[in-house]
C-alpha cells in the first residue's frame, strides 16, 4: 500500500531539498512550471526552496509518496502593508511530479492550504493558472470543490486569448 501524506514544513530534513528539487524539476518538464518554462539550474532551484522557508508570508506544504517529497503547494499571505488585500491569500507553486500523480496528492495539498488559509482568517484564496495549462482551470475547480466538499454556485470568468480563466 502506498503511503500518501501532506505536511507543513518549516525546515528541510536531510534529503528533502534533493527530493523537492527533483519533483519540481519533473513537474516543470511536464509543463507545470509555476513560473518556470524550463527547469532552472539546480543551484537556483535549491536557493528558491531555501528562500521560501525564510519568507514569513510563505507557508510551504509538501506531499510525500512513501516518504519521498513528490509535490508541494504554498500559501502566500499578503504583505502586511497591503490593507486592501488583507482578506486574500494565494495558493501558489502547487504541483505533483508526474510519477506521483493519481494518488490524491493534489487534493490533499489543496485541502491543507485551504484549511490553513481559513484558520488564518482569509476569506479569499486566489489561484493563478498559466495560459498554456488550458485544462487546469476546470481540473483545479474540481479538486477544490472535492477538497472542501462544495458545489461551485458561481464563478467569475475572464477570457484570455479565447479560453476561460477562473477566479474563485
Curated annotation (Swiss-Prot):
Domain N-acetyltransferase intervals: 7-168
UniProt cross-references to InterPro entries, sorted A to Z: Acyl_CoA_acyltransferase, GNAT_dom
Keywords associated with the record: Acyltransferase, Transferase
EC number: 2.3.1.-
UniProt keyword annotation of S-adenosyl-L-methionine present: no
Catalytic class of the enzyme: transferase
GO molecular function, one term: acyltransferase activity, transferring groups other than amino-acyl groups
Matching SUPFAM superfamilies: Acyl-CoA N-acyltransferases (Nat) (SSF55729)
UniProt xrefs under CDD domains: NAT_SF (cd04301)
Protein name: Uncharacterized N-acetyltransferase in hisH-hisA intergenic region
Record organism: Azospirillum brasilense
Amino acid at each position: 500500500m502506498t503511503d500518501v501524506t501532506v505536511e507543513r514544513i518549516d525546515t528541510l530534513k536531510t534529503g528533502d531539498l534533493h527530493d523537492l528539487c527533483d519533483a519540481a524539476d519533473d513537474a516543470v518538464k511536464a509543463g507545470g512550471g509555476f513560473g518556470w518554462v524550463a527547469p532552472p539550474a539546480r543551484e537556483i532551484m535549491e536557493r528558491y526552496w531555501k528562500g521560501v522557508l525564510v519568507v514569513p508570508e510563505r507557508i510551504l506544504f509538501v506531499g510525500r509518496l512513501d516518504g519521498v517529497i513528490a509535490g508541494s503547494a504554498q500559501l502566500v499571505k499578503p504583505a502586511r502593508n497591503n490593507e486592501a488585500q488583507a482578506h486574500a491569500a494565494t495558493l501558489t507553486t502547487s504541483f505533483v511530479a508526474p510519477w506521483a500523480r493519481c494518488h490524491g496528492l493534489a487534493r490533499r495539498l489543496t485541502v491543507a492550504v485551504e484549511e490553513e488559509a481559513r484558520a488564518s482568517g482569509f476569506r479569499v484564496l486566489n489561484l493563478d493558472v498559466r495560459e498554456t495549462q488550458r485544462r487546469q482551470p476546470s481540473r483545479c475547480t474540481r479538486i477544490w470543490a472535492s477538497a472542501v466538499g462544495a458545489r461551485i454556485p458561481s464563478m467569475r470568468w475572464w477570457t484570455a486569448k479565447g479560453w476561460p480563466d477562473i477566479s474563485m
